[in-house]
Amino acid sequence: MTRPGDDVPPRSGDDVRVIGSGDDVPVNLPGAEVPLVDAHVHLFTSALPLAARAWTRPDVDLPVGKFLTTMDEHGVGRAVISAMSLLGDLNDYTIDALREHDRLRGTVIVEPGVDRYVLERMRSDGVRGIRFQWRRLAELPDLDDPAYRRLLFRVADLGWHVELNIEGERLPPVLDRLVRSGVQVVVDHFGDPDRRAGYAGKSGAALLRALGSGRVWVKLSAGYRFGVGTDTLARYAATLLAAAGPEHLFWGSDAPFVGARQPVTYRDAVESFARIVPDAALRGRISQAANTFYFD
């Protein structure tokens, strides 16, 4: 695993240098036109109170100022704060960061009965969707419940999306119901493919089918969690590219890598993206897709 300071092997595309608040770092961008967009990062401080059902108590944090420096050092132009399950519906830190920094957008966790006016205010602050963090739930919420039907109606009406994080084996019915509701859906972490079958199994087939709707996007994020090699991650990415094209994929670092079994750095995440999508032009189109989706 490459660490900061190690030599970076040459890759296809133009080699430019992005000057940040630290040393200038070589970054390959297609034509030096499209900076990286990190579509999945968690920003928080250790002072924030965790939710009662938090699945872990992280020994790291990632304040917004530190992350902005990290972005500059790695040629990342913009980023999307993904609502963190550990904080529940405490979205204060995310909203403050969005208000202060136009290069950031974010998602929030809300109760299904949240008022429309609250959502509209969040939208003006830079929020672009809600997150269903439904991993590790003993029982999934009922999307046909009137409260959830109203929530999905409001999300669609605002032009927002539902960010979905769920185990692969539980994905098909939830994703199908969301697509039928008319909302846009962004599926986290490659869609949690089966480690043996990849996208050939039931859950993978459901994801590929949903991509055909034109209302579903997938994040190439958190591959370090899967316990598979770069070649396998590259096959996952290639399958998704073949199914939907780069316009329906986003890249995300998942910093600060809470729950990682081995140390992971931000540079590791950036370099992993280059390895699993070795074509610099495709990486540029993936970043442009995130620019369009979250910032236009």
Kindly give the residue locations of the regions a language model identified.
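Short, acidic/polar
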Residues: 61-69, 113-122, 202-203
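Alpha-helical scaffold segments that flank or form the walls of functional sites
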Residues: 54-82, 87-100
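Hydrophobic faces of well-ordered beta-strands that scaffold small-molecule active sites
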Residues: 37-41, 79-82, 105-108, 128-132, ...
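Active-site gating/metal-coordination segments in enzymes
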Residues: 88-170, 217-219, 223-225
